Regions:
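Histidine/acidic-residue-rich, glycine-tolerant segments that coordinate divalent metal ions
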Residues: 3-133
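Active-site-adjacent C-terminal substructures of enzyme catalytic domains
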Residues: 106-225
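Conserved strand-turn element in the central/C-terminal portion of the radical SAM core barrel
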Residues: 1-2, 74, 147-152
């Protein structure tokens, strides 16, 4: 918990100190820590840091960041998640759904409570989903949810991304790189606080070594879009 606050304070200090930072940082997106603990949905996030949502903790984030926390990604199926996201939505923070094993009902309840976005739609899910219904179909069909898509050439096949953009409409889609600190690094094995033992392949695929799970991206959108 202290680590998140210390990093938020560093961002806030940069915004106050450096003009370029002030112009470039519109807000902070906190992806977790209230996400699914299951392998697959949690992605590369360390299981030991996953915890239940807490308004008190959210308030400590905003205090450290001087109000810069603009978006939070949460798994809506967690105990207390709907009440939590309803409250932070009333405070002007964008609520996004992600790294989740949510049911169709969970997703609709979250939208009712004020959720506005699907984080990395099509990723941060179980490796195998029912044909239908499933969380992807439910989020595509939910008109109150916009979608962010990782278009690094690895997280989503081109055809899948095309269908998702057509379903949501270009005005409700945000393209992201999901680039991490290994972007542009030579192929090889690295160590990270997120994911642990990381492999960077020749095509800049960043994954947890020995698994199919991705651990961010090794490219920028300019490289692939």
């Amino acid at each position: 918990k202290a680590d998140i606050c210390s990093r938020l304070y560093a961002v806030q200090e940069a915004v106050e100190t450096f003009p370029y930072s002030r112009q470039m940082i519109a807000g902070v997106h906190i992806e977790g820590p209230s996400i699914s603990s299951k392998d697959g949905p949690r992605g590369a996030h360390p299981k030991e840091h996953i915890r239940s949502p807490s308004i008190k903790e959210f308030e400590s984030w905003q205090e450290a960041a001087c109000g810069l926390v603009a978006m939070i990604t949460i798994a809506p199926e967690l105990h207390g998640a709907i009440d939590y996201l309803r409250e932070i939505a009333t405070r002007g923070v964008i609520v996004a759904l992600g790294h989740s094993d949510a049911s169709e009902e969970d997703i609709h309840k979250a939208a009712d409570a004020g959720a506005q976005l699907s984080t990395h739609l099509g990723n941060g899910l179980a490796g195998t989903l029912p044909r239908h219904p499933n969380a992807v179909w439910a989020q595509l069909a939910e008109d109150r949810l916009s979608a962010s898509l990782i278009l690094d050439g690895h997280h989503l096949p081109k055809s899948t991304a095309q269908v998702m953009i057509r379903a949501k409409g270009i005005e409700r889609v945000i393209l992201v790189s999901d680039s991490v600190k290994f972007a542009g690094m030579e192929p090889g094995r690295y160590t990270s606080s997120i994911g642990g033992d990381i492999k960077v392949s020749c095509d800049q695929r960043v994954s947890i070594s020995g698994t199919q799970f991705l651990a961010g991206s090794g490219v920028s959108l300019l490289d692939v879009v």
